Amino acid sequence: MADLASHWNAVFAAKDDPQLGWYEADVSQTLKLLDLVPGLAGATVFLPGAGTSLLVDVLLARGARLVLDDISDEALRRLRARLGDREPQPSWLHHDIARPLPPGIPACDAWIDRAVLHFLLTDEEITGYFRNLRALLRPGGHVLLAEFAVSGASRCAGLDVHRYSVAEMAERLGPGFGLVHAEDYTFVNPAGAPRPYVYALFRRQS
């Protein structure tokens, strides 16, 4: 974890939020799919790679109970400072989401990942990620994955990425998950470059 944590700490330390390549001032694309999820108010929502995302503010305003995970303690420090005493207070987790989770993490009703999974490259890392997802997500819960599409960039933030199709997402999740909705989306990053994403919302059936 140390090398990747150092990399991401350096990325966050070097730039203000609006300069980060994945920064979104408008999180409406994610909300478009989350609007298909009933009962987010009061739900427990896990965000791997929460970073400094403005989605956190929106979900808190909607009454969600958040578990915010990131490999970068610098990102979590900045996010804590921004949120201040806002209620409900999130739970905080400084952890590599590809590694086994520590005990005591609450089960969640939704798992929301924008641009995290695609940084995991080895089969061990990807398998570990989905093992954690399945361990935390309740039956009936929802998973939103938003990753670089097959036609997307091959690198981001100085790292190689694994690009995804909806079919591969479904295969990795396994037979207990059903697709609710998926769509392609081109995000224009702060530098003005187009970044093709695939957004997919799944529901856990068992």
Predicted feature descriptions by range:
Residues 1-106, 123-206:
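Class I (Rossmann-like) S-adenosyl-L-methionine-dependent methyltransferase catalytic domain
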Residues 109:
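Conserved acidic residues
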Residues 112:
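A conserved beta-strand element that flanks and buttresses the S-adenosyl-L-methionine
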Residues 115-119:
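Short catalytic micro-motifs in class I SAM-dependent methyltransferases
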